[in-house]
Amino acid sequence: MLDKRIMMADKQQNNYQLVRNNIDNIFSVSGAADCKTLEGVFASKVEAEKENTEALNKIIRVFRMAGCKESDVYSTASIYSHKLNPTAQTAEGCAQRAIKQEKYTEALAFYDEALQLEEIDSLKYDYAYAKAAILRQLGRYAEARSAAYQAISFNGKEGEPYILIATMYADSNPFGDDKILAKTVYWAAVDKLEKAKSVDPACSEAAQKLISAYRQHYPSKEDVFFKPELKPGTMFHIGGWMNEDVRCRD
């Protein structure tokens, strides 16, 4: 009899949890769940429940499902929850707040923490790519490339990390005053863009636009006359932080 009651209680608890999850899902994906509406509903609740991990995580879940991760309410709930019980999701929320405050070093630290706590590769990809984007903005290109490759290691079917690397290559000049050799970075950039197209058809259009633009800056035939080491078909090494071998081309 006791076992039967326990089984019935467990079943009721499971049913309750299922209903609650369904309510969260419906609310988050419905038209009523725009970010401003969610902020109006949950702003006061976050403060009232700032010591309640379960309540805070429920609020965080609703905001994530509604795509409202830039909301102040979301990041505030994340900060409170992170102090109580750090998770990858709360670390990301803390990173979002740091970014809005332009505290990029803090944001990078939170994304590192999220990467350590997360077990799902698709989410690890998001955190690593976010790191790469921040580092690129800070001009820390070598670190940004490392973070981009880290993102690729978690999801090799995404082209955005390759595009990010390409834009950094195109923005670099490891050759000082040598304006002809400086053009070779565009070969390296296009190589990454072609890779982006090959792994991710969804980014083909964006990659192709950059390819068309970068090709305009390739070394000309006249340039090659003065720099025979750039003869089409030969390999050329680009040093500095890039450290890439590229095939010379027209």
Model-derived features: positions:
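Structural register within alpha-helical repeat arrays
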Residues: K58-F63, A77, C94, A130-K131, ...
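Solenoid-like repeat scaffolds
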Residues: A43-K50, S78-P86, E113-D121, Q150-G156
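Terminal, low-structured helical/coil segments at or just beyond the last alpha-helical repeat
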Residues: K195-D250
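Short coil/turn linking the two alpha-helices of tandem helical-hairpin repeats
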Residues: G67, E119-S122, R136-G139, A166, ...
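Residue-level recognition of tetratricopeptide repeat
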Residues: Q96-R97, Y129, A133, E160, ...
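TPR/TPR-like (Sel1-like) alpha-helical repeat modules
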Residues: M1-M8, R145, Y149-S153, L181-E205, ...
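Generic helix N-cap/helix-start motif at coil->alpha-helix transitions
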Residues: M1-L2, Q12-I23, D34-L38, V46-I59, ...
